[in-house]
UniProtKB/Swiss-Prot annotation:
Residues 641-663, 682-802 are annotated as: Disordered. InterPro entries: AH/BAR_dom_sf, BAR_dom, GRAF_fam, OPHN1_BAR, PH-like_dom_sf, PH_domain, PH_GRAF, Rho_GTPase_activation_prot. This is Oligophrenin-1. Residues 380-564 form the Rho-GAP domain.
Amino acid sequence: MGHPPLEFSDCYLDSPDFRERLKCYEQELERTNKFIKDVIKDGSALISAMRSYSSAVQKFSQTLQSFQFDFIGDTLTDDEINIAESFKEFAELLNEVENERMMMVQNASDLLIKPLETFRKEQIGFTKERKKKFEKDGERFYSLLDRHLHLSSKKKESQLLEADLQVDKERHNFFESSLDYVYQIQEVQESKKFNIVEPVLAFLHSLFISNSLTVELTQDFLPYKQQLQLSLQNTRNHFSSTREEMEELKKRMKEAPQTCKLPGQPTIEGYLYTQEKWALGISWVKYYCRYEKETRTLTMTPTEQKPGAKQGPVDLTLKYCVRRKTESIDKRFCFDIEANERTGTITLQAPSEANRRLWMEAMDGKEPIYHSPITKQEEMELNEVGFKFVRKCINFIETKGIKTEGLYRTVGSNIQVQKLLNAFFDPKCPGDVDFYNSDWDIKTITSSLKFYLRNLSEPVMTYKLHKELVSAAKSDNLDYRLGAIHSLVYKLPEKNREMLELLIKHLVNVCEHSKENLMTPSNMGVIFGPTLMRAQEDTVAAMMNIKFQNIVVEILIEHFGKIYLGPPEDSQVPPVPPPRVTARRHKPITISKRLLREKAVFYTPSLDDVEDEIHHPTPNGTIASNLDPPKQLQHLKLPMQKSGEMDPGRKSPSRPVSDCQTEPCLEADMGKLVYRLQDGGTKAIPKASNGPVPGSGHTKTSSFHIKRPAPRPIVHHKEGDTDCFSKVRPPGEKQTIIRPPVRPPDPPCRSSTSQKPESKPETVSSNAEEIPSSVVASRTRFFETASRKTGSSQGKLPGDES
């Protein structure tokens, strides 16, 4: 379980529980800061100490493995799980090459040290400055408040007013400092997932390509690197979307701190001073009080513990509440209550007159307060005019601008958007707007469509089903995700389901042109997740679930054909699978548990062997058994496949043998890489009987310019074995970790086809596995395949049998 979110509403209350939670965040920040320093220190030692390189790698890997991400909320997305486990994977990779001498690239410092140092100094350092300001303003406010509360009511009115203004000013400054500090510390807590991992990832990438002895390991690392980059980019997109919503919530909290109440919280809570009478006089004791209006229970927690004894909270059942007359007591802001558990009257003092009125209103006192209504943005309705507007927008977009780069991501002019909406939803002549004969551009149309959907009185996917949809997206059972969302879609009201089908069908059409507009299902999920789904309460906890809303929309886009083919056979949602005991135990993408790679030994198969292989193909070539002695080693050309050319779950075919090197390729930038990984290709690549059709060459991606020994053929079990999660072993038998004989396939994509390799005796393509039922699962399917094949045996050299 991670840290609970720090609600902005708690900044106003400044309760002991809030301070305790804030302390946990501060400890985590210090731990992260120390971790970054360790990584920087160990990375520098790795670059400078070439002679002690092996020991430096070991220390660095231990540092990475010792760190574990904490997170906000109760569940991680698949991408966040991959990021959380990434340091463990990095450490395993470094341990594999502990005994190998490697050369460090010249720009290693720029890849690792500078980004981490920048993050530590700018982000964490800025957070510490916010902390100092928060503590300083808090100390000044409470010191002034204590002096202020001891002022006699017999002072001059001008002096009292001046003191009140000063207290209000300090309270406002402290509240703003608290809001800024909470916002900053949560932002650093979330952003460190990619700001820390990305520099280490880039450093490892340069580390492995700098030495020819580690090229084989680098080839294994590439799919993981690309998949992790995809996870980082998705997490960054979710973070950007969440940050925008949290900034809006922060602004609303600044305007009206008391308007956002969390469900299940007390009616009112805050600090009160209680008058306690003793034999030697009267004293005022500070308590943190919570009042539940339904049960009329007042819980008082002392903040000043007496030495030698720890006092717990006291629960009182309220009888009545009445304001204390000003002339009857020397203190200000007082009111009296009576409780069943105590005899006599209990006198309480509030920090201000406004706060006293809030307490009396909650306790049904004699001075209720009437809040002025909060102006609310005009809401849209899901009616015939709305359907007409959505259809006209979709028709215009698909006709005029479906190939526009950054479609829906680029924002139009607010003035033009309001002008279009006011004209279309004019009560006098609704819908009387011609999109084609006007000066409306594509950005205005897309922004207007998003504005209409976001400002519906109830979101398209309804408040009622919001929690169930988010819960389905949080499940680590990939089949359950799709089944539950499929079932919940048909629980929507008729007009909501019709509108959702209209929109998702349009988004599918947009994604089919992702090569031109660069808008993949993941990108569309980030944009339309907060648009089609919205929590009923305005809280930080709800904002943290936006990333799961994005996943719901992404699944709807990727499985549109299946979901809207008809309702599921069982109208009820499938039974909820057992919840995650801890998100850390979820199996992430991994390369550290792949099969062991041995030195490659190849031979020229005889004609009989080739014929036998044709009739009995194996995933990676002919089984090495009862053959002639091995011949001279040959090297293998490893052309880099276009990311996304292989079906999810399909193993890469054996490579043709060649003595030539691959052509140099340039490293694509992150945005293009993520696009290629997510695009997956919507059109099948043409094939010919003798190899790829001219013009269907590979798109350039990051490559390694080396000659690599061809993998040694080994025995593989059936493809069906890859679907098993585990196999039963005798007690005491340890699991054997074996590396695969060939480079793992490139990261899977949405829908793609692999190019047919040239026909050669040594190359036999493997059988295709079934595509996973959830496209989200395709991101991690092939990484889990290698670790599940525990029953596969290693190949043997010809003549090794005894």
